[in-house]
């Protein structure tokens, strides 16, 4: 198992940038005798996240195709990120890629990643995230819950998009803003004077079009 986990981590780090979560594993396909590796994603087939996992799939099946088959489920086909993490816990799927805010309900140490203005520079950010000893302690926080974080990726600068320009926190006052389903993100948004509206990524654009929310993080 540890050898397999090392293979997965190396492959994903080369192919993409991602907070990859693995669980207890699922069953083999008895008819083919192959081990089915199921991966849930929230992004579409055109997103770099999916493209990275396609490369991972190709790599695994080229090297170990007689033993493993990788099945990808994009577009939240199996549910939002929190649901996908729960499926990973139970072994219904093997991996998912999720934002750190979605891990807060499984280990509150992940709230640190939702804090605004935490780092003074991009260099400080990468220095912290590339500190293996520190990150391994973070990853270990979910071991007793049936899942293990394997690696991370950088999704860029946090930002808000809305029906009007957001230049300072004051511009958020009175707006209904979508945030991830994260206690820390909800507190942050409300502290800025907005009304936090937690929802899954797949619901965001429809909610904006229908006027349910004014914008999103």
What is the meaning of each model-derived region?
Residues 25-41, 54, 61-69, 143, ...:
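Immediate post-signal peptide segment of exported/extracytoplasmic ligand-binding proteins
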Residues 57-61, 89, 99-195:
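Contiguous mixed-secondary-structure segments that line small-molecule binding/active-site clefts
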Residues 38-55, 74-80:
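Extracytoplasmic "Venus flytrap"
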């Amino acid at each position: 198992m540890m050898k397999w986990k090392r293979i997965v981590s190396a492959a994903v780090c080369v192919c993409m940038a991602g907070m990859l979560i693995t669980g207890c594993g699922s069953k083999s396909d008895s008819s083919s005798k192959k081990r089915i590796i199921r991966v849930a994603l929230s992004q579409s087939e055109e997103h770099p996240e999916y493209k990275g996992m396609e490369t991972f799939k190709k790599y695994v099946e080229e090297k170990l195709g007689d033993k493993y088959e990788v099945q990808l489920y994009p577009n939240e086909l199996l549910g939002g990120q929190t649901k996908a993490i729960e499926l990973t816990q139970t072994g219904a799927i093997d991996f998912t890629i999720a934002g750190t805010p979605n891990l807060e309900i499984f280990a509150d140490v992940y709230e640190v990643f939702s804090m605004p203005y935490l780092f003074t520079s991009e260099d400080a950010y990468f220095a912290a995230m590339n500190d293996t000893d520190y990150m391994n302690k973070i990853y270990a926080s979910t071991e007793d819950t049936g899942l293990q974080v394997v690696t991370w990726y950088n999704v860029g600068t946090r930002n808000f998009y809305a029906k009007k320009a957001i230049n300072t926190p004051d511009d958020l006052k009175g707006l209904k803003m979508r945030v991830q389903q994260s206690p820390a993100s909800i507190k942050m948004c409300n502290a800025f004077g907005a009304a936090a509206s937690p929802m899954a990524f797949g619901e965001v654009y429809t909610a904006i079009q229908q006027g349910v929310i004014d914008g999103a993080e």
